[in-house]
Curated annotation (Swiss-Prot):
Responsible for the transport of dicarboxylates such as succinate, fumarate, and malate from the periplasm across the membrane. It comes from the Bacteria. One of its GO terms (cellular component) is plasma membrane. Its main location: membrane. This is C4-dicarboxylate transport protein. It comes from Rhizobium johnstonii (strain DSM 114642 / LMG 32736 / 3841). GO terms for molecular function: fumarate transmembrane transporter activity; malate:proton symporter activity; succinate transmembrane transporter activity. One of its GO terms (biological process) is L-aspartate transmembrane transport. The lineage of its organism: Bacteria, Pseudomonadati, Pseudomonadota, Alphaproteobacteria, Hyphomicrobiales. InterPro entries: C4_dicarb_transport, Na-dicarboxylate_symporter, Na-dicarboxylate_symporter_CS, Na:dicarbo_symporter_sf.
Length: 444
């Protein structure tokens, strides 16, 4: 009589109540934050420290996660030329799809024309509203961005939490470990042993995700209000629909060609997506995404190189936003851009977008950098979208995250560093017929 109930209890142990899942908690927190911010806006704006504190907690652990993942991954490579190949293929992928995202934003803006008919006089715009963003944009330069990748000190790179500086040192340190050979085994073993508690710490910190998402969303709705969305609903709707189609159609086609389902991938990283939705920062999900991609069958060396690099060089959502928003401003202020002007805008955006970090508001600063170089579109026109940029930030961050997840799997497969059986198991068996490895085109 006792055995049956005990068996039933044992079977039920494998299934956690739905409310204990992180994604359910984050989703509920986002909904609660929206309601609180709408009905009690003053109180909602006071909850901003909750979101800021959570993002700081995550940033605290990003540098150790990148260092351990990259250094141990490269140290375990028998062929150091693979490091160059992985980096080269990743940059080729980033350049291709980042440019495609910019072009799609340009095409959609010309077809839909979300700013047409607003007839705003550029002289009536207040340049002081965006002066801070413009100043930050002028501080950016291609040469400065590239030289800034090299840290002044190793400690400084980790203390500042600069992703590219930490990645730069981690790659060099991993190569040094691999070149030393057997003598470096104690160091490699120590770093491998350190990886487990660091990722356990990530899991512990993620328990606070619902609190962070609640505070960030309550602040956003409380400060900007739902009403600010309605004023520029055409632009917001166009951007969200374009980004969704980019993920489902463009990235979906890439995923299908490389043997997996984009829908299954979205389901697999749903906790990271909801975390980004709540905080508007794709950086908040970086440690979790790296862990998930490794569990999905991508070798650690590929994950460690592709994802951190992608956070500066593979921002599909930010790229769609940049060309779409630039043309919206031109249309709203009655400025007719020739195809030559639009091509110039595209070329400038291709360069300026490469320095955008995965933090809240980086897309707006990058847009300012682009417009400051293109004389046809007034930088002051950014004041038109300043109030709604926070609502578009979520979509940018979500699209960026999915783009980097797809890129990791594709590059891993190109390098034959992908365990397809493990990927199928992680995605719930939702994989398709695998195209030939080596690139986007079938091997001849």
């Amino acid at each position: 009589m006792i055995a049956a109930p005990l068996d039933a209890v044992a079977d039920s142990k494998g299934k956690k109540p739905f409310y204990t899942h992180l994604y359910v908690q984050v989703l509920a927190a986002i909904a609660a934050g929206i309601l609180l911010g709408h009905f009690y806006p003053e109180f909602g704006t006071q909850l901003k420290p909750l979101g800021d504190a959570f993002i700081k907690l995550v940033k605290m652990i990003i540098a150790p996660v990148i260092f351990l993942t990259v250094a141990t991954g490269i140290a375990g490579m028998s062929d150091l030329q693979k490091v160059g190949r992985v980096a080269g293929k990743a940059m080729l992928y980033f350049l291709t799809f980042s440019t495609l995202a910019l072009i799609i934003g340009l095409i959609v803006a010309n077809v839909v024309q979300p700013g047409a008919g607003m007839n705003i006089d550029p002289a009536s715009l207040d340049p002081a509203a965006v002066a801070g963003y413009a100043a930050k944009a002028h501080e950016q330069s291609i040469v400065g961005f590239l030289t800034n990748i090299i840290p002044t000190t190793i400690v400084g790179a980790f203390a500042d939490g600069d992703i590219l500086q930490v990645l730069f040192f981690s790659v060099l340190f991993g190569i040094a470990l691999a070149m030393v050979g057997e003598k470096s085994e104690p160091v490699v073993n120590f770093l491998n042993a350190l990886t487990a508690p660091v990722f356990k710490l990530v899991a512990i910190l993620m328990k606070a995700a619902p609190i962070g998402a609640f505070g960030a969303m309550a602040f956003t709705i409380g400060k900007y209000g739902v009403g600010s969305i309605a004023n520029l609903a055409m632009l917001i709707g166009t951007f969200y629909i374009t980004s969704l189609l980019f993920v489902l159609v463009v990235l979906g086609a890439v995923a299908r060609y490389n043997g997996f389902s984009i829908v299954a991938l979205l389901r697999y990283i749903k906790e990271e997506l909801l975390l980004v939705l709540g905080t508007s920062s794709s950086e908040a999900a970086l440690p979790g995404l790296m862990n998930k991609m490794e569990k999905a069958g991508c070798k650690r060396s590929v994950v460690g190189l592709v994802i951190p690099t992608g956070y500066s060089f593979n921002l599909d959502g930010t790229n769609i936003y940049m060309t779409l928003a630039a043309l919206f401003i031109a249309q709203a202020t009655g400025i007719q851009l020739s195809w030559g002007d639009q091509i110039l805008l595209l070329l400038v955006a291709m360069l300026s977008s490469k320095g955008a970090a995965g933090i809240t508001g980086a897309g707006f600063i990058t847009l300012a950098a682009t417009l400051s170089v293109v004389p046809s579109v007034p930088v002051a026109g950014m004041a038109l979208i300043l109030g709604i940029d926070r609502f578009m930030s979520e979509c940018r961050a979500l699209t960026n995250l999915v783009g980097n997840a797809v890129a990791t799997i594709v590059v891993a497969r190109w390098e034959n560093e992908l365990d397809t059986a493990q990927l199928a198991a992680a995605l719930g068996g939702q994989t398709g017929e695998m195209a030939p490895a080596g690139g986007l085109q079938p091997a001849e």
